[in-house]
Amino acid sequence: MRRAVVVFSGGQDSTTCLIQAINQYDEVHCVTFDYGQRHRAEIDVARNVSHFLGVVAHKVLDVTLLNELALSSLTRDNIPVPDHSESEKSAIPSTFVPGRNILFLTLAAIYAYQVEAEAVITGVCETDFSGYPDCRDEFVKALNKAVSLGIARDIRFETPLMWLNKAETWALSDYYQHLDFVRSQTLTCYNGIQGNGCGTCAACHLRANGLEQYLNAPEKIMTEMKAKTHLV
């Protein structure tokens, strides 16, 4: 039996990865992390989405220690969440949470070890990575090697969205006939608003632009997505 663990936030990217994983693996588990994020509504959204999609198990892990160590506008009420125009001016935006993906992927791999899963799946993306250094392909591959050595098991870190832009990510959800579900039921917004979000933060801006691009040229973008992902 093929098993996978999805690092799951309930956002567009991780939900798209989860939908694909359900189509590719016999058994899928989700891991969601409570790190004291301001947009805590994502935890409830993640529970609801994973239940609706029928995963085998969904773990919510308390990693609030990260909140004590990592200064970010996603974990501190006194640091404002920038709108998309402000985010574009900074190489590393204030929404970056230092060490987040290091911790998440490592803990997900430990859980994968426990349930004998062959893969940990994450929705990080270098094409639209918003300036986050821990969303880069180089980082994920390096950590994958270190973790596999550390637990003496070849658990594979999969990044299905790594080279897709946001429009192509929408195409991937449409390929699996879940575009409307992802559009209405996920939470990507840094201000914690489900669906279309606040419309002003960087995450909402990226998501909305990608959707508009896809809806304006669905056949072209679907073809490009299939070529990148080797889907038929």
From Swiss-Prot:
Positions with a binding annotation for ATP: F8, S9, G10, G11, Q12, D13, S14, T15, T16, C17, L18
Pathway noted in the entry: Purine metabolism; 7-cyano-7-deazaguanine biosynthesis
EC number: 6.3.4.20
Note describing how the cofactor binds: Binds 1 zinc ion per subunit.
Positions of Zn(2+) binding: C189, C198, C201, C204
GO molecular-function terms, A-Z: ATP binding; ligase activity, forming carbon-nitrogen bonds; zinc ion binding
UniProtKB keywords: ATP-binding, Ligase, Metal-binding, Nucleotide-binding, Queuosine biosynthesis, Zinc
UniProt catalytic activity: 7-carboxy-7-deazaguanine + NH4(+) + ATP = 7-cyano-7-deazaguanine + ADP + phosphate + H2O + H(+)
Class in the EC hierarchy, top level: ligase
Biological processes annotated in GO: queuosine biosynthetic process
Cofactor(s) named in the record: Zn(2+)
PANTHER family assigned: 7-CYANO-7-DEAZAGUANINE SYNTHASE
Function: Catalyzes the ATP-dependent conversion of 7-carboxy-7-deazaguanine (CDG) to 7-cyano-7-deazaguanine (preQ(0)).
Annotated family: Belongs to the QueC family.
Protein name: 7-cyano-7-deazaguanine synthase
Designated gene of the protein: queC
